[in-house]
UniProtKB/Swiss-Prot annotation:
UniProt protein name: Subtilisin-like protease 2
Alphabetized PANTHER family for the sequence: CEREVISIN-RELATED (PTHR43806:SF11), PEPTIDASE S8 (PTHR43806)
Subcellular location: Secreted
Thermal response of activity: Optimum temperature is 20-30 degrees Celsius.
Listed EC numbers: 3.4.21.-
Family assignment from sequence similarity: Belongs to the peptidase S8 family.
The entry's keywords: Glycoprotein, Hydrolase, Protease, Secreted, Serine protease, Signal
A GO CC term attached to the entry: extracellular region
CDD domains for the chain: Peptidases_S8_PCSK9_ProteinaseK_like (cd04077)
């Protein structure tokens, strides 16, 4: 990106201020996600709230000057984030440069980038049962009872490994949105995102079979990605999602990240309902992101007997449980491919689809209203071994 001479000159005015800042103050701004899975030399820089676009352009000129003095091997500024309430960027650079950047009065804090992973487990043979569970008060049903609106008018952004949009399950309702995996094609190379999309809005497997789907690729063929890449995906949704009509579904996670949580929270404030996986470590979900993001709908997994899956994270940040063991849905490889897998990744799209379904029914104009509706109609007290979590199973309010 090119900058005018006037911006570069303006940036130079800030350099003495940056150089003069105490070293302790610089280091105090630099945080680590609660993780061992740090991405070396990659950082997420978060601006103070209220910083305007002119200030940001000036800051990028200042950063360019800082980087010009350092090793050229680093890539420099990558993803840029511009969600109302959350502005910043990702940068690859050395520790010396990041210390200078931290000294800027425009920077609120900086977080070391961390890895995220798809929250899916082993592949098994099995049969579809999740749709029956979320449309009946009792276990064991093989039928899905739902209103014919089926999520019509709603859009679900699947922030994941992409979607095989040509799959017959999607009937032309899935499209490509954005790709934040460098050098990868605009398709799902893993299968995880396609499986989640099928549970959300597939013709056969979907909770909201008339909802629209948008693929936002942040995970590679191995199901891996970065916090900075996920935030880039969230930024895309925040800029394109329609207030009150959009759902963001994320069946992924990693260790706690304040930056990732902040991006989620800002997107919710902008009118997008966000549904996230609790995680698969059988641990307290408050230590994971985006599971711990405030006001996101965090989903744990149960099996066909309403028992919390042993892998499912738990705790006070959970909002609801949904089917997550032996869930059958669409897959990659052919237009009719399917697969049966387990994980909180599989529970999450049931609830994302439910959110889209409820939006399609009408009368819900905000993420808070959607979350409240899911909580009010859910099946209370049926989860075995909730382990300190809310005892609530997702339900669409239709079947007996």
């Amino acid at each position: 990106m090119k900058f005018s001479q006037s911006l570069i000159a303006l940036a130079a005015c800030f350099l003495p201020l940056i150089a003069a800042a105490p070293e302790e103050a610089q280091h105090a701004k630099i945080r680590s996600p609660g993780a061992q899975d740090i991405i070396l030399d990659s950082y997420i820089v978060v601006f103070n709230k209220g910083v305007n676009d002119a200030d940001i352009e000036s800051e990028f000129a200042s950063v360019s000057h800082i980087l010009s003095k350092r090793r050229p091997a680093h890539k420099g500024v990558g993803h840029k984030y511009n969600i109302t309430g959350f502005k910043g960027y990702q940068i690859e650079t050395d520790t010396g440069s990041i210390g200078e950047i931290a000294a800027s009065p425009l920077v609120a804090w900086i977080e070391r980038d961390g890895k995220v992973q798809a929250n899916a487990l082993e592949t098994r043979s099995g049969a579809t049962w999740g749709l029956g569970r979320i449309s009946h008060k009792a276990t064991g049903s093989n039928s899905y009872v739902y209103d014919s609106s089926a999520g019509s008018g709603s859009t679900v952004y699947v922030v994941d490994s992409g979607i095989y949009i040509e799959h017959s399950e999607f009937e032309g309702r899935a499209k490509w949105g954005a790709n934040y995996i460098s050098g990868s094609p605009d398709t799902d190379e893993n299968g995880h995102g396609t499986h989640c999309a099928g549970t959300i809005a597939g013709a056969t497997y979907g909770v909201a079979s008339k909802a629209n789907l948008v693929a936002v690729k942040v995970l590679d063929g191995d199901g891996s990605g970065s916090n900075s890449g996920v935030i880039a995906g969230i930024n895309f949704v925040g800029q394109n999602g329609k207030d009150g009509k959009s759902v963001l579904s994320m069946s992924l996670g990693g260790s706690y990240s304040a930056a990732l949580n902040s991006a989620v929270e800002s997107t919710i404030s902008n009118g997008v309902t966000v549904v996230v996986a609790a995680g698969n470590d059988g641990a307290d979900a408050s230590n994971y992101s985006p599971a711990s993001a405030k006001n996101a709908i965090t989903v744990g997994a149960v099996d066909s007997t309403d028992t919390r899956a042993d892998f499912s994270n738990y705790g006070s940040v959970l909002d609801v449980f949904a089917p997550g063991v032996d869930v059958k849905s669409a897959w990659i490889g052919s237009k009719s491919a399917s697969n049966t897998i387990s994980g909180t990744s599989m529970a999450t799209p049931h609830v994302a689809g439910l959110a889209a379904y409820l939006i399609g029914l009408g009368g819900l104009s905000s993420p808070a209203a959607v979350a409240s509706k899911i909580a009010s109609i859910g099946i209370q007290g049926s989860v075995k071994d909730p382990k300190g979590s809310v005892n609530l199973i997702a339900y669409n309010g239709n079947g007996a």
